[in-house]
């Protein structure tokens, strides 16, 4: 099973797409940073013909590659890009009551290298990974948006364990189920936090394994399972293998590994391995038995995880462009998928083919 391409745009020649989210007829896309572009806004009321309505660059030396939208507000990160000598660090807030024409209304001015990936589904508090001054790498923070014109830091948490030589303990982002946050923490893997009080997070437990770069930790609501990606961060042949695991949160153990895509992807240039998952946000497609994974040069993969011990791939799509690096995705409630490429490929809109569409409908939460 697969998908058909509904439309494609190179985002005005700034095809380094990263995180993306839909809000009404607007689609917000962050950019990796190679192009110098920061954020693109598209009118996707006609998915077959997406139209750019706004686009603005990132500050010099900075990438603004993450977006979150809820409560008629858009949040955008500011983070040092690579080893830039001059950059800005912070969190920017836009009013999107007019979704296609965001208006900047607030900013938290940070220090250090800045904010990486934000998670916010509405309400007073957002949370994100960030590198404040005095820290060599990312920790996890909570930010108060009660006054969106003056966001402020409300809490921070970091793993209080010695980092072994050759390992990198760095927070990425957390997804919540109830009062538990499942936080990807790089080579420290999966950390569970009690966030009954978001301003006072407490460590519950940690599960680790061989391999690192733990990125996204998606709880499958009501199943006691978390699907975890380890991000591939090395190009080309001979890169370390990175996998997607299913973790039993009650037994605190890995129960299975999603089968990697078949083919010669590992021998191709650029990255081969997992990156992001569709995160089952409210208002989007939601399923506790189908998991969508972006897999860099192996495109988009869909897995059936009804039997957590025996997950299987049920659908795939690889863009025809040269050297694809499929990066992030958003799945609409109707099963339509928006996918970004991190190099030059820009944005794709995909429609599930009939057999796959039937499966998605049957498994929708």
Each model region followed by its residue ranges:
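Feature marking well-ordered beta-strand scaffolds used for ligand recognition
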Residues: 1-365
């Amino acid at each position: 099973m697969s998908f058909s391409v509904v439309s494609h745009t190179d985002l005005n020649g700034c095809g380094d797409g990263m995180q993306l989210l839909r809000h009404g007829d607007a689609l917000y896309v962050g950019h990796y940073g190679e192009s110098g572009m920061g954020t693109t806004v598209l009118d996707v009321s006609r998915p077959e013909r997406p139209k750019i309505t706004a686009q603005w660059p990132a500050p010099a030396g900075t990438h603004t590659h993450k977006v979150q939208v809820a409560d008629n507000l858009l949040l955008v990160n500011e983070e040092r890009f690579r080893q830039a000598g001059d950059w800005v660090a912070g969190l920017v807030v836009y009013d999107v009551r007019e979704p296609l024409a965001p208006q900047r209304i607030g900013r938290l001015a940070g220090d250090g290298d800045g904010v990486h990936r934000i998670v916010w589904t509405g309400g007073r508090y957002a949370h994100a990974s960030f590198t404040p001054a005095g820290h060599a790498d990312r920790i996890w923070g909570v930010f108060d948006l009660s006054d969106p014109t003056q966001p402020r830091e409300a809490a921070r948490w970091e793993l209080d364990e010695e980092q072994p030589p050759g390992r990198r303990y760095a927070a990425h982002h957390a997804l919540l189920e109830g009062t538990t946050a499942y936080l990807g923490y790089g080579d420290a893997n999966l950390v569970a936090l009690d966030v009954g009080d978001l301003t006072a997070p407490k460590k519950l437990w940690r599960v680790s394994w061989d391999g690192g770069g733990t990125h996204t930790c998606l709880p499958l609501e009501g199943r006691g399972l978390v699907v975890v990606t380890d991000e591939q961060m090395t190009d080309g042949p001979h890169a370390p293998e990175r996998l997607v695991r299913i973790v039993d949160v009650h037994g605190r153990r890995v129960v299975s590994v999603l089968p990697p895509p078949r083919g010669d992807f590992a021998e191709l240039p650029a990255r081969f391995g997992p990156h992001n998952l569709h995160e089952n946000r409210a208002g989007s497609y939601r399923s506790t038995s189908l998991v969508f994974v972006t897999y860099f040069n192996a495109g988009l993969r869909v897995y059936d995880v009804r039997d957590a011990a025996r997950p299987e791939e049920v659908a795939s799509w690889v863009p025809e462009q040269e050297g694809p690096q499929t990066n992030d995705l958003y799945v609409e409630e109707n099963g339509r998928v928006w996918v970004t490429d991190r190099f030059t490929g820009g944005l794709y809109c995909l429609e599930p083919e009939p057999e796959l569409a039937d499966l998605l409908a049957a498994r929708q939460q």
